[in-house]
Amino acid sequence: GIEALKAVWHRGAVDADGKTGDGAGIHVEIPKDFFIEKVEVTGHTYDNSEICVGMIFLPRNDYAAQENCKTIVESELTKNDFSIYGWRQVPVNPKVLGEKAFQTMPEIIQVLFKSNNPELLNKDLERKIYETRRIIENKAFQISLNNFYICSLSSKSIIYKGMFLAEAISEFFLDLKDERFVSRYAIFHQRFSTNTAPSWNLAQPFRAIAHNGEINTYRGNKNWMKVHEQEMNSPLFDNIENLKPVIQQGASDSAALDNVFELLNISGQPAPLAKLMLIPDAWSKKNKTLSKDHQQLFNFLNSTMEPWDGPAAIAGTDNEWVIAANDRNGLRPLRYAITKDNLLFAGSETG
């Protein structure tokens, strides 16, 4: 995954300083053996429970704000029946950054924690973590902690990203050099920003997807989500109000798509279905090659969610499925290949 990311360096923009990129990153499974050691470093004995990890950006030079952020995280995790192992300073090498990337670089830390309920597993655990994260984000926003950002908070996956060039990712994040840092999948992205200015927060992948393209219907989609929020209801969450607003403040079109995709996943829609709801396939009732079941499915989905239209190639995961797909007009490049040893690659280029 890291080598593949380095190979698409040409897909991204580079600042005049020659080292600052629009953003690059990688989304992988939490490497369990790697983080067991990190838990034990905190002075705790690993008890075979699911290790949950949060990858967090804090304001680098505002120490009071850092403490406020950490206090909110600790408080809400504890309130929601999680136990905190401790905080971990993520080892980084700022020397590989360009001047602009270094000037805006956040403090990068991880929080290691577990659920106090051993029966809370998989989707149920992820749902609880998601709701807790939304509470944390909303509280931080209410007190104007603007440089606080959670890249990932999960028992399943973790995201390493920033405003460096793709080839510098493992030189910047030293964790990625560790032999125990393994995963069954990797979603990687090299950004060329179009609608929004580059920032550490808007580097991709996001929590559920990586997106190449633009959402031309974004303003309408955002307004429709505000309408849908009024009708949102589910027994799966403690309080549905904790999840609002679904689209976070300051989100780019790609980040907003990720917000909605993630909510659908966490609410029980598998990644392939969430993709069809948001970025539907091209279809017509006149298409005789399409089965009646598929026509009925697409017709139903069309009545439940407005399409997020525009040039788009996405890769995403709900921690069970890993998907890659095009928009219905095929306006962004996406190719796939299966190797002789059964590795599936999908990306903007082949070879």
Task: Show where each model-derived region lies.
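Conserved short alpha-helical segments that host acidic/polar catalytic motifs at enzyme active sites
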Residues: G1-G351
